[in-house]
From Swiss-Prot:
Phylogenetic placement of the source organism: Eukaryota, Metazoa, Chordata, Craniata, Vertebrata
Name of encoding gene: MT-CYB
Family, per entry: Belongs to the cytochrome b family.
Residue ranges crossing the lipid bilayer per the database entry: 33-53, 77-98, 113-133, 178-198, 226-246, 288-308, 320-340, 347-367
Record organism: Erinaceus europaeus
SUPFAM superfamilies registered for this protein in UniProt: a domain/subunit of cytochrome bc1 complex (Ubiquinol-cytochrome c reductase), Transmembrane di-heme cytochromes
Swiss-Prot/TrEMBL cofactor(s): heme b
Protein location: Mitochondrion inner membrane
Protein name: Cytochrome b
Cofactor stoichiometry and binding remark: Binds 2 heme b groups non-covalently.
Residues that, per the record, bind a ubiquinone: 201
Keywords: Electron transport, Heme, Iron, Membrane, Metal-binding, Mitochondrion, Mitochondrion inner membrane, Respiratory chain, Transmembrane, Transmembrane helix, Transport, Ubiquinone
Length: 379
């Protein structure tokens, strides 16, 4: 009799995805972030579910319900801070996962890459709506500023904003619908993740060399399950250190003040993981131009497979591309820093230069480096 995991219709899918999956023998720890993202997603759904049991999506009681969760619910503070800091861990893993895809040329798996970018966009939308729910000052003003950007769209802009708000300002209707969407989106993300994995297993994993690994593969279990578990332990160590010792390190003090439409915070800014896009938005003086730049900063990732000019897939053997890649990483760190600073010189100028370099490196420098390296290798 054959092993049940190989014959049972449901077990067979799990077996082919996580146990007997043929995997390149040389994939490094940079390939751990996919499983870490899965763990983050499960953690967020579980903690979010428990928070939703005690949260009320009403402008009068939302802030109080968060206070109630932290003070009166058993381990409510732990669930709340795990959820808040879990989002930061999620985006940290997400950015490293995308960075790995860019460095090792994984974007040449077109379907997997495109589904991944759609996942990024949905995750960003989910995180933004979640930030509005505590109904603190930064929640309210962040929602007002970011949703108001859509009014820059010609003809339909103003109507679109009021349609999203469900009112003439960010109000009870806005909070209720944001809670509804924030609850349902993670389940859409789970479905998209399954499609992401389906396309990945269709093509097979990439590896650090970027060369085909058909002749040298090993089973996923036990080798990579153990490796993933080690990564998960490290991630939980960092997450729990944040939650238990520095729960408010990545938050904003303004969000401990209840939302007040009559008082604007001195400096409106989103969570740290949106700061790079926020800096690009602010670097253009024109409203519509800023909104287009904001959307393009994410949508530009769709172009990467078509901008690949090198004969080598991975950047491992490409020193010029490596330099440009690490300059791009530095540039994103600078943009993140600029997004948290007030709108005044020299921050305005630095933000504009960093924004120009961001688009320049992806659209021109990386493809150009590929052509130069082809010539250097005499291909």
């Amino acid at each position: 009799m054959m092993n049940m995991r190989k014959t049972h219709p449901l077990m067979k899918i799990i077996n082919n995805s996580f146990i007997d999956l043929p995997t390149p023998s040389n994939i490094s720890s940079w390939w751990n972030f996919g499983s870490l993202l899965g763990l983050c997603l499960i953690t967020q759904i579980i903690t979010g579910l428990f928070l939703a049991m005690h949260y009320t999506s009403d402008t009068l009681t939302a802030f109080s319900s968060i206070t109630h969760i932290c003070r009166d619910v058993n381990y409510g503070w732990l669930i709340r801070y795990t959820h808040a800091n879990g989002a930061s861990m999620f985006f940290m893993c997400l950015f490293l996962h995308i960075g790995r895809g860019l460095y090792y040329g994984s974007y040449l798996f077109y379907e997997t890459w495109n589904i991944g970018i759609i996942l990024l966009i949905i995750t960003m939308a989910t995180a933004f709506m979640g930030y509005v729910l505590p109904w603190g000052q930064m929640s309210f003003w962040g929602a007002t500023v970011i949703t108001n950007l859509l009014s820059a769209i010609p003809y339909i802009g103003t109507d679109l904003v009021q349609w999203i708000w469900g009112s003439f300002s960010v109000d009870k209707a806005t909070l209720t619908r944001f809670f509804a969407f924030h609850f349902i989106f993670p389940f859409i993300i789970v479905a998209m993740v399954m499609i992401h994995l389906l396309f990945l297993h269709e093509a097979g994993s990439n590896n650090p060399t970027g060369i085909t690994s058909e002749s040298d593969k090993i089973s996923f279990h036990p080798y990579y399950t153990l490796k993933d578990m080690l990564g998960m332990m490290f991630m939980f160590l960092i997450l729990m250190s944040l939650v238990l010792f520095y729960p408010d390190l990545l938050g904003d003090p303004d969000n401990y003040t209840p939302a007040n439409p009559l008082s604007t915070p001195p400096h409106i800014k989103p969570e740290w993981y949106f700061l790079f896009a926020y800096a690009i938005l602010r670097s253009i003086p024109n409203k519509l131009g800023g909104v287009l730049a904001l959307f393009m900063s994410i949508l530009i990732l769709f172009l990467l497979p078509y901008l690949h000019t090198s004969k080598h897939r991975s950047m491992v053997f490409r020193p010029v591309s490596q330099c440009i890649f690490w300059l791009l990483v530095s540039d994103l760190l600078i943009l993140t820093w600029i997004g948290s600073q007030p709108v005044e010189n020299p921050f305005i100028t630095i933000g504009q230069l960093a924004s120009i370099y961001y688009f320049l490196s992806i659209l021109i420098l990386i493809p150009l480096a590929g052509l130069i390296e082809n010539y250097m290798f005499k291909w």
